[in-house]
Amino acid sequence: MKKLLLSLFFFFFFISAATAQTQLEMNEKASLDYKKADGELNKTYKKLVSLLDKNEKVLLIQAQKDWIKYRDSHCKFEADPYTGGSIKPLILLTCLEEITKERTKHLKESLKNLNQ
């Protein structure tokens, strides 16, 4: 997973480098990218919840709470080796964005399966 995150970091670093010139700018862009991914997740989650029966809602709500704990803990773990460095927020935010996008894909699959 570390290799994947480092690969993603360097990929996004070089893409971001065209517009962001400083570490602060890269961190700000990563924050905006994560917020965008989180917004898409919340939109998909709300749509899915609205279509579920009471029992399914309870199960999804608990699953989402558990997933949030996992996401936050995992990304803190991935960013920890960079403690004290200005790159740490970028590593953390990139991890949050990628895991959030993956969760959104899973929720969209559930939504698609529900609509079939």
Task: Label the model's feature ranges.
Residues 4-15:
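Sec-dependent N-terminal signal peptides
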Residues 4, 18-116:
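N-terminal alpha-helical modules
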